[in-house]
């Protein structure tokens, strides 16, 4: 770390959250700066762009009142970092890691760069083991595995904030590792009332005791928004790879992050890509999502559940499209289910957890879990097909088996997907077996005769 250097007379102009300076000092990209205004107020900034004769600094606080002639620049000589230490759980921070809960800063036993630890791919281990979210459509059908990155695709007006809060309150590990579990909850570009509802829900449920919260408000600068997930993931890496905890990071809403990235890119004068987003958005998102994982030489894990809203309900939009290339599946919310008061309105058919097989089945959840999940998928897909037939030819033209599928589809949505309270995996599986009892044995082709006799018909006779 270099000695802090102060320079004056470098500022040329201020545009939104950006400060344009003459390049008269030796700095690097992403290096931290202190910007001292004429009023004596110190603001944090970072070097965003370096050119031959100038540099652009992102100011991470409001630039209101920041002049040009009387602005001083203090060069810190290192990238932006976050001080971390014990007693991190239960704390609430703002966009850039400053306390919002009225308590003093966390005693810094260690300072970590917010752009993440450089992990040799050879050190990575295969994600495995099950995280119970309390949501049947996820736990039973699209299971979340420690070390996975599994996004939740929503749309404007759907209850993704409510679902994210519910998962943060309910999520847990099964077995002896439960006391090593932690949540990092990140609100990105959220309104004040939403941020307060997040905070109130976590405090009321008692989940705040094993949670760290980072809240970026909608009226804060775009530059701050770009740093919020990085500060949060730095705290998560400390919990996972220093304190050896199993950490679940819930980030909502990554669409707000990408919109901020487009805004900042445009203000830099960069050439836009698809729909105005910068061409490097893929690598930028990867620098966030790829911080999830497991390491051979650490007991802790870092799992991500990012939430994003589909602009215009378009799953082919660059934001969900690029996210899908990086992550390992998706959980998809559905407007039609939401209109029918199904909560959570998760459409299990387009949803997918690519790593589900590594955390479910014998030795992880239940030996019959994979078979039950496969049979429910197949049966519900048939039920949706029969609904289309019924809309064309009417119920009178359907066979008896098709009518049974119609009843199964309705019961599956109302009894299995829909839930008013958290469920354990055992409760979710019991509902799944019970719903399959509506179908004849000949249709249960994904189950063995033993499974049909023990779970499906045995339960239907109770």
Language-model regions: role of each:
Residues 1-133:
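Acidic-enriched and Gly/Ser
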């Amino acid at each position: 770390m270099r000695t802090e250097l102060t320079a004056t007379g470098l500022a040329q102009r201020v545009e939104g959250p950006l400060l344009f300076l003459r390049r008269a000092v030796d700095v690097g990209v992403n290096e931290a700066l202190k910007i001292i205004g004429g009023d004596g107020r110190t603001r944090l900034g970072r070097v965003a762009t370096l050119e031959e004769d100038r540099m652009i600094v992102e100011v991470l606080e409001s630039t209101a009142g920041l002049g040009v002639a009387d602005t001083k620049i203090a060069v810190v000589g290192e990238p932006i970092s976050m001080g971390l230490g014990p007693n991190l759980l239960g704390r609430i921070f703002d966009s850039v890691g400053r306390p919002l809960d009225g308590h003093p800063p966390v005693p810094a036993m260690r300072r970590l760069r917010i752009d993440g630890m450089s992990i040799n791919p050879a050190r990575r281990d295969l994600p495995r083991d099950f995280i119970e979210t309390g949501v049947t459509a996820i736990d039973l059908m699209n299971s979340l595995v420690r070390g996975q990155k599994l996004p939740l695709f929503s749309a404007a007006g759907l209850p993704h904030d409510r679902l994210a809060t519910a998962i943060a309150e309910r999520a847990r590990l099964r077995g002896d590792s439960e006391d090593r579990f932690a949540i990092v909850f990140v609100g990105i570009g959220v309104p004040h009332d939403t941020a307060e509802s997040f905070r109130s829900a976590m405090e009321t449920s008692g989940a705040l005791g094993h949670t760290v919260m980072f809240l970026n408000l909608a009226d804060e600068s775009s530059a701050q928004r770009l740093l919020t997930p990085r500060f949060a993931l730095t705290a998560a890496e400390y919990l996972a790879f220093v304190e050896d905890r199993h950490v679940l990071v819930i980030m909502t809403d990554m669409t707000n992050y990408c919109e901020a990235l487009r805004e900042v890119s445009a203000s830099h004068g960069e050439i836009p890509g698809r729909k105005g987003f910068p061409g490097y958005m893929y690598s930028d998102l990867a620098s966030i999502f790829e911080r999830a994982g497991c390491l051979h030489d650490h007991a802790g894990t870092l799992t991500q559940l990012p939430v994003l809203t589909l602009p215009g309900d378009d799953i082919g939009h660059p934001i969900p499209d690029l996210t899908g290339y990086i992550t390992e599946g998706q959980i998809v919310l559905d407007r039609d289910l939401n209109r029918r008061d199904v909560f959570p309105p998760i459409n299990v058919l387009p949803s997918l957890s690519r790593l589900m097989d590594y955390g479910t089945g014998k030795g992880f959840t239940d030996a019959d879990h994979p078979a039950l999940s496969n049979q429910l998928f197949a049966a519900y897909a048939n039920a949706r097909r029969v609904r289309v037939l019924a809309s064309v030819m009417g119920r009178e033209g359907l066979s008896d088996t098709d009518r049974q599928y119609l009843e199964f589809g309705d019961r599956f949505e109302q009894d299995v997907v829909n839930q008013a309270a958290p469920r354990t995996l055992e409760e979710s599986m019991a509902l799944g077996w019970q719903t399959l009892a509506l179908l004849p044995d000949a249709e249960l082709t994904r189950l063995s005769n033993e499974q049909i006799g023990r779970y499906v018909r045995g339960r239907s006779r109770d």
